[in-house]
Amino acid sequence: MLKRISLLVAIALSGFVIAPKPAQAQALTPYVLPLDYELMTEQGRYLASEAQQLAEYRQFNRALTLAQLAVQLAPNDAQVLALLGGLYLQAGETERALTLLTRANSLAPEEPRILFALGATHLQRQDYLQASTYLERGLRREPNNANALFDLGNAYLLLQQHDEAIARYNASVAAQADFWPSINNIGLVLYEQGQADQAVAKWEEALALAGGEEPEPKLAIAVVRHAQGNCRAMVNAGSQQCQRALSMGMTALEQDSRYADEDFLRQNLWGHRLMQTTQQFFGAPAVRSLLAEL
């Protein structure tokens, strides 16, 4: 509640107090409530915390609405600005995210979470070098952030610096042992380097850490096992290995049909070699029939 403060109006002229003339028409002096900026900022932070909780429950639209109001109340609070920027990034509005996060960074230049968010924004903008710069700055202040190490690994992968990418993915797992996306992406790098068996081993490890349910490592294992079994040849198509690979891959596609979209796979950093193998898998008659239904 805003506090209502009484206001005494006096008009001073040459040291004299001039009384109003009741017999004459006179404009009323407007009564203006003074703004309590400290209270507004406090209310903005409270709304931002509510928005953060909604985002954690994946209620992003409601979170975005609250965060927008929070910024109106606390326009100079770095954390509030960063929250709204992060929600815009989640919504794919990268330019709005960049504007807010840049402003937040100017207010709190050493805050690692803001630097991480700027790195993620530049990743989406495909400015991988800038992304790596922000992520490295943030990691100097918070070196064991598994998500940021994962993002930095992705930036290095997209810069074709594979050894650096694997090093950051391994650091991510060292920081958080069950961080399966980093293990999954080590598999992506290894496969592009021609190490198919080692890649499959990483995907199997990632799948186990994810409780056996994540479609991405499941599909990757399937398409590579299908290729290794030479399952396109009619003589091999009925083999146990080929049937297991087909079943696993089709289950993954049924779990999440986005993985049937080659553009989506590329966005998830599936490289040229793995995409070629996947296209062969998608050409199998049973898979083609499934794709037509998805």
Task: Describe every region a protein language model picked out.
Residues 26-35, 231-244, 248-294:
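Terminal, low-structured helical/coil segments at or just beyond the last alpha-helical repeat
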Residues 44, 78-79, 112-113, 146-147, ...:
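Helix-start (N-cap) detector for alpha-helical repeat units in TPR-like alpha-solenoids
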